[in-house]
Structures are given as C-alpha cells and as structure tokens.
C-alpha cells in the first residue's frame, strides 16, 4: 500500500480527556475504541485539538503511547510531534516512532516566524532523525507562517515527507498543490466546514475535529467523497455543517469537549488559558448536535 492510500480518509484529531490535572487515561482509551468501532480511518493524538500546547512533555508522550497501544494497529496513528523548537520536534518524533506510531504530524514552527528556507531546514532536520512518514501541518491562522507550495514541493523530494494537513481554508490551493507537486502528495484538510469542496478539488481526506463526536457520519461522508459520490456526501454534509460551525464559535477544542461530555465520552475539563464555553455557545452546540441526530 502506498503512503497516499495509507493515510487517506477521515482521521480524528483526538481531544485529550482530563480528570482534574491529569490525563483521564480510561476515557481516552474508551474514546479511541469508540472512534474505531464507528468506522474512522485514522487517529491523530496530541495535535491542536489534543491541547498539545498545555501538555507537559511527559503527558504528550504518554498520550501517544496510550493511543498506539489502544489502537493496536487497527487504524493508522499519526502522532502530533511538532514544535517551534527543532530539537524538541525531533525528540517528540523519535519518541512517536519508538512508541509505534504510523506517522508524524509536524506543525510549521509558530511564534518565531521562520522564512521558507527556515521551514525547509526545520523539516529536513526532523526527517533525518526518523523513518516515520511526516505530514506537514500548515496552519497559518495559528502559526502565522504559511508554507508555500514551492517549499512543499522541495520537501516532497525527501523520501519520508509525504503530504500536508492543510488548514488554510484556501480551496483553490488544493488544485495548486496538486498541479505543483503531483497527485501522490497526500492532501488532508484540517478545516471541517470546507472538507466537501476540498475533496471535490482532489483532496485525499481530512483530519477532523467534528469526528470526535460524529465519527460514523464523518467516515460515511468521507467514503462517499472517495467514491466520487458527491451527491450522497453533500446530504451528510448538510447534517454536519451546523456542527462544523458551532464547534468553532469559541476557541477549539473547548466546544467539542463540551459536546463530548454531552455524549458521556469525557469530562468537560479544559486547561487554561482556554476555558469552558459560554451558555450561549452551549445552546448552539446542543442545537447542532440535535440537527445531526447525535442527541
């Protein structure tokens, strides 16, 4: 199986359940089993949705280990291993490989604003330290820097850099990336609301926040997209769209953690500086969950 096929489909950007000041390991394991039983195609622990900025290094590594062990190779695990410190990203990536992850999701360095040359050098250094397939996580809305398609094309020449999680919401870029780099460069969207358009333009899948609470709907939606049955996909998308909106009214993952707590998947615990959502937002999430027949 080629790398592109290995990582296509609907992947869940997993939340990290907490119990007070600790990771709720039991709820995390149960969430993973729930995802797989509902048909999700892959799991992504300790990314943005997993609150990686507020996890200690020990917690970060523990979450990867739990996910890999509980998944037991039933679906691919793409571990979040990014940092704005190249040495730290290398350490997290090497740990993910040792733990048994199937791939690494590496965010573009945030805050320190590297040039395109700096971005290339950062990913090149990480690639030399691991044999894991690396997926670039391009999210300029959070990291400030935006990796262009030329830099991605150059990085794709490195054997184990295999694709991008594109969280730009820039749909024409899907076509630009495909024509600049080629169809074997794996394109996964990180924006739930534009996933349908992303797939129409030639995407290979998604890394989704919404699928934390609606894995069955999201995986069925993605199956129709991959089968080029966009009429059926659109029907499911209509069920999910209010949820895609409501889960981002306040800073993610606060809304999806509330929604997950409504389903009994975890407690509504989130770490500062993020806070639990307002009552007004809770009403929006509840309404969207009802629209999707989740409650």
Question: Model-flagged regions — what are they?
Answer:
Residues 8-14, 42-45, 77-81, 104-106, ...:
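Hydrophobic faces of well-ordered beta-strands that scaffold small-molecule active sites
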Residues 9-17, 34, 38-40, 49, ...:
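C-terminal alpha-helical cap/extension of soluble enzyme domains
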Residues 22, 35, 67, 96, ...:
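Conserved, mostly hydrophobic/aromatic
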Residues 40-66, 81-87, 106-118:
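Glycine-rich, proline-tolerant flexible connector loops at the mouths of alpha/beta enzymes
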Residues 54-79, 119-136, 180-181:
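Alpha-helix-loop-beta-strand connector modules within alpha/beta enzyme cores
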Residues 128-129, 142-248:
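Catalytic alpha/beta core domains of metabolic enzymes, predominantly
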